[in-house]
Amino acid sequence: MTINKETGTDPDPGYKPTLRSQDKAALKELLHTRLVECGWHKDIKEMIRNIIMERGVDNINRDQLAAQIVPQARALVPEVVKNEMMLRVHAALDK
């Protein structure tokens, strides 16, 4: 069988590796622990409080708050945490 751009190189192009539910739970717990340890969790809670104080609790809803916080929160995740999680996810997928 020849391999070209049309046929691809994957033996099963429909195959997508998935994480087991135990692995997902363990990874979520690890991520939460790392974010608390590095102070990210505290910083995000403070950002949320500041936004609510500035705009007033009656002038902002959950969706507006999330739209404002999520991009900043993602950008503030330390690279070391991102790298560790990436390695752990790849290891879990290779099982």
Curated annotation (Swiss-Prot):
- Could you say which tissues express the protein in this record? Expressed specifically in testis.
Query: Which GO terms fall under molecular function for this chain's record?
Result: chromatin binding; chromatin insulator sequence binding; transcription coactivator activity
Q: Which domain of life is it from?
A: Eukaryota
Please give the biological process terms from Gene Ontology that the record holds: poly(A)+ mRNA export from nucleus; positive regulation of transcription by RNA polymerase II; regulation of transcription by RNA polymerase II; transcription elongation by RNA polymerase II
| InterPro entries for the chain | TF_ENY2, TF_EnY2_sf
* Cellular component terms (Gene Ontology): cytoplasm; DUBm complex; nuclear pore; nucleus; SAGA complex; transcription export complex 2
Similarity-based family: Belongs to the ENY2 family.
Function of the protein? Testis-specific paralog of the ubiquitously expressed transcription and mRNA export factor e(y)2. Cannot functionally replace e(y)2.
Its recorded name reads Enhancer of yellow 2b transcription factor
* Source organism: Drosophila melanogaster
Protein's gene: e(y)2b
